[in-house]
Amino acid sequence: IVNKVNPISLSYTETLNRSSNQVIGDVPAGYKFGWMPEHGLVQSSEVGSNLGSWDHKRDGSVRSGVKLSRLITVNFNFSQNFSSVISGSGIEQRTMSRDYIAVDELFNTGMPFPGWSFRLAGVEKWPLIKWVAKSASIDHSYAGKETRSWQFEDISPDDINFFKLANFVDDNKDYERSSRINMNFSPLIGFNMSLKKNISVTFRHNRNLSLDELPTGLTIRKDHSYTSTASYTHRGGMTIPLPYYG
């Protein structure tokens, strides 16, 4: 079983950009080079209301897959990111996004969940298809996202815990400015087929679901689409004899 699991890829990136206006004293080297988040110095009384800015981002992701057989491949990926931006006036904007899936049509219940892709090859050996196709495969994939944003003024909220995000969402519902859940099955079912004489045919059935929540209300969208394409490639040439006198 271990040999069928693709390598697991883990990634984590954290960036902090900060500016402080009219600082008094010598700035510590650790703050200059980035391993100290605070400079520990006072700012001039003449600085006014624009003390500086703060921009903190954290991104994490994990990717892997499983080759169930020579013909069946499944890949997974999950990502989550947070950002916190504090302007010079002290207003803080926070945003988050993560892979997500809702389990009911009204998006009332859901959970963090990785996106996936599935491919079944060897379909050209199926009855009927084997008479017309040189190669054929079936595809299916899912990608879902939950995104939220908050605005804080005259209050310092707790830090967002990477593993306890639900607690932060519940505790700060009054400060939430927008939220969106998007689920894309692209394709819900896809079919690829290569015929004789360099003819290729594809078919896709896509399904997209989304929920937008704003202070003015909720909007739910459900879209279905069908696409089909066919292409033909011709390769050929001609030979022209050239006389040679020697």
Model-assigned labels for residue ranges:
Residues 1-246:
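Exposed, low-structure sequence patches enriched in small/polar residues
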